Every structure is written in C-alpha cells, then in structure tokens.
Regions:
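Double-stranded DNA-binding cores of transcription factors and transposases
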Residues: 1-11
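DNA-binding alpha-helical recognition surfaces that contact promoter or target DNA
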Residues: 5, 66, 83
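Short, basic alpha-helical nucleic acid-contact segments in DNA-binding proteins
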Residues: 9-17, 74-75, 83-96
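Short Lys/Arg-enriched helix C-cap and helix-to-coil transition segments
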Residues: 14-29, 92-105
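A short, amphipathic alpha-helix used for macromolecular contacts
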Residues: 24-77, 118-124
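Well-ordered mid-protein domain cores that form the structural environment of catalytic cofactors
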Residues: 98-115, 134-136
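RNase H-like DDE/DDD metal-dependent nuclease/strand-transfer catalytic core used by mobile genetic elements
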Residues: 112-132, 138-254, 371-374, 378-382
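C-terminal, beta-rich DNA-binding module of retroviral/retroelements integrases
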Residues: 263, 267-382
Length: 382
C-alpha cells in the first residue's frame, strides 16, 4: 500500500517528488526517569566497589541493565549504560588478562562435573564470610548444585555429591582443585616426617565415595586449570554480592534465597556466553540427542541405604570386650569378632544435631548407633 501511494505521488509531480523522511523527535534519547535510574545504580556500584573486604572490584553494566528492568521497570541498551558510566566517571578500564590455554573440552552432558567452593564476604552487611559450594556440568554449563554454608567440611561436599547423584544421576567424572578435602598431597597433608605415603596414596572422604560409585576423579594441576573451575563462581559471586548489598542481607538464610534467585536466572533464563544457549535447554537437548553420560543411581550391593554410600567413613578394631572406641565414645559391637575391623558409615543430621553411625563388618550390616555431631568432630574428616 505504501509503495502504491509513493508511486501515485511520483506520477502526479515527478519533478518535486522526494522520499526524504523528517524525524519529529530524536531516537537516541532516553527519558529522564531512565537516566536517573541508571545514575542511581551506578552510584550504588561505586559505593560497593569502595568498600573494604569486598570481592567486587569493578562495575557490572549487564547487572545494572537487569536491575533497570526488574526494579525500575524501564529499559536501556547496554552501550547506553556504558556511555553514561564513562561520562559520569563510573568506569574502570579493564586490565589485560593472559588467555587461558588449558580448557577442558567436553562433548557430553555428565562427562565432567566441575566442583569447588568459594570463600567470600557475600554481603557487606554481614560480619561473617560464607562458603559457596557448587557443581556445574561442563558441557551444558548447567548448575547442578549450589548452596552457601558457614563452614567448609567434607560432609558439606558429600551432601552436594548426593544431591547431584539422586537428582541427575552419576556423572562420568568430577573435576576438583587440590584442596585437602579432595586430594591427599604428600608433604602438605602428611603428619609423618618419613613420607611413606605419597600423593594420592590416601583417599579423602569425597574420593572414596566417587570411587565406590565408579566415577573418575580429575584434578586441576595448575593455577590456569584451577581458573577453569573458578570462572563459574565469578558470575554468581558478582551478582550475589551486588544483590545482597542492595537488599541489606545480614543472615546466611537470606543470602541463600538470593543465591537461589540468581542460580534460577542463570540456569533457566540466561544465555551462556560460551555455548550461546540457556544451560537448562542445552542440557535437555543433549539428553534428547543421546549425548548424556549421566547414569541412574543404583545402590551398590550389599548396601541397604544411600546413607551407606553418602557418609563419612572410618574404621575401628573390636577390643576384647566387644566394644569400639570412637572420639572418646564407646559402642557395643555385635556381629563382628574381636580384633577385627568394623567399618563406620557416619551420617550427620544438621537439623537435629545428631549423627547416625551405621556399622558394617565386611559385607554384613551389624547395627546403628547415634551420637551428637559435636562429639564426632566433623572438621577432622578429610
């Protein structure tokens, strides 16, 4: 229709015909409300960067863009926000970084799960630092597990392993840094001056569980490779700290709610910069295409419960009185000969404060005892 109108105008007066279009108002101008909202968010960012003991060191303009939509109910293009930041002094020039040359490349979901923790002051209004524990599928970039805890223990990481196994299945391999919770390193973790045990001769609690489940374990052997694990944390860390600061979060429970919201955004709405896909839809597509190495969790024989797998492990020798001693606690033992070793599978309950101690002799389940978590000394388990 428009073409017909133009053709008619041309035929009526070809000498004076023009197609010039006059704009009635500029298109690159944003309204005053949006302008003020951008500056407000930029000022909050600057105050956050200036705080001491704070992991945030630069501006996140993409985060501000999201805040404009969610909190101010307006929109602005990312280049516009950056332009205003430069004009008003809210800009820090990025440093040149050395390219990471040891990428772990995977082709299947579940081929490799990156697992680690990050210790930071997640809210400037809290007087404590907390640990963020996450597990992320390398191929899909989907966050399989995420939680904030006040203390980093082997048990906290075992809970993460259990959640991933029961919800998503058993992965082909796990990728860790060389923290003592994940790996025994001779010289660093040995108490003996004559080092009869060399690196990897002693399996930490986490590795014992993965070995029982037939899951391979890989380690980051360089600072560059460790950066591969830490990069997913930077995105979460960046947004969690900023949101906690804006919402005045003081308690870990409130911070966990912020974490859930950001993880939900990351998993189900955020298009990943590397894959170009939303992690959830990429994970689902890989499964639909038969490109998943996740196996269904099946309880290994002869165990009776998932508690026998996802537990802290120890062993004790039955004394002539058919008792064992554990952290100054004494338990009667039935079903195991004296001078024989009994396997302990310990499952703490953080809500009740009590731990269930499941006793095994070889392939036989011989009973359950209970003890207070504090008497077990969870921090001693590596």
């Amino acid at each position: 229709r428009r073409f017909s109108e133009l053709l008619k105008s041309y035929k009526e007066n070809p000498d004076s015909f023009k197609v010039n279009y006059r704009r009635e108002k500029p298109t690159r101008r944003i309204d005053k409300v949006t302008e003020e909202a951008i500056l407000t968010e930029l000022k909050i960012e600057k105050d956050l960067i200036d705080l001491d003991d704070n992991p945030i060191v630069d501006y996140n303009y993409s985060y501000i863009k999201d805040r404009l939509e969610s909190e101010h109910h307006t929109t602005a293009a990312l280049p516009t926000i950056i332009d205003r930041a430069k004009k008003h002094g809210f800009y820090i020039k990025k440093k040149n970084k050395v390219a990471h040359d040891r990428e772990v490349v995977t082709n299947y979901a579940g081929e490799l799960v990156q697992h680690d923790s990050s210790h930071h002051k997640w809210s400037p209004y809290s007087d404590k630092k907390w640990y963020l524990i996450t597990s992320i599928d390398d191929c899909s970039r989907f966050l399989l597990y995420y939680n904030l805890v006040e203390a980093e223990t082997s048990w906290a990481h075992i809970c993460a392993l259990e959640d991933v196994a029961l919800i998503y299945g058993l992965a082909y391999s796990y990728y860790f840094d060389c923290h003592s919770i994940f790996r025994f390193v001779q010289g660093r973790d040995s108490f003996w001056r004559n080092h009869y045990k060399v690196t990897d001769d002693v399996d930490p609690q986490v590795k014992k569980i993965l070995t029982d489940l037939g899951i391979k374990v890989r380690y980051a052997l360089s600072p560059q490779a460790k950066g591969k694990i830490e990069r997913p944390y930077r995105w979460l860390q960046d947004r969690i700290v900023r949101t906690c600061a804006r919402e005045g979060v003081k308690e870990i429970g409130d911070a966990i709610e912020v974490l859930k919201e950001e993880a939900e955004r990351y998993n189900f709405r955020q298009r990943h910069s590397v894959t170009g896909e939303v992690p959830y839809y990429r994970l689902r597509r890989l499964k639909d295409e038969g490109k998943s190495l996740f196996r269904e969790f099946v309880l290994p024989s002869p165990y009776l419960s998932s508690k026998d797998i996802f537990s802290l492990r120890d062993e004790r020798t039955v004394n002539p009185y058919r008792k064992i001693s554990f952290n100054k606690l004494v338990f009667d033992i039935k079903g195991a000969p004296i001078r024989e070793k009994v396997d302990l599978r310990i499952v703490p309950d953080m809500i009740s404060g009590m731990a269930e101690i499941r006793m095994w002799y070889k392939d036989n389940f011989i009973g359950i005892h209970t003890a207070r978590n504090e008497d077990i000394n969870l921090n001693n388990f590596k």
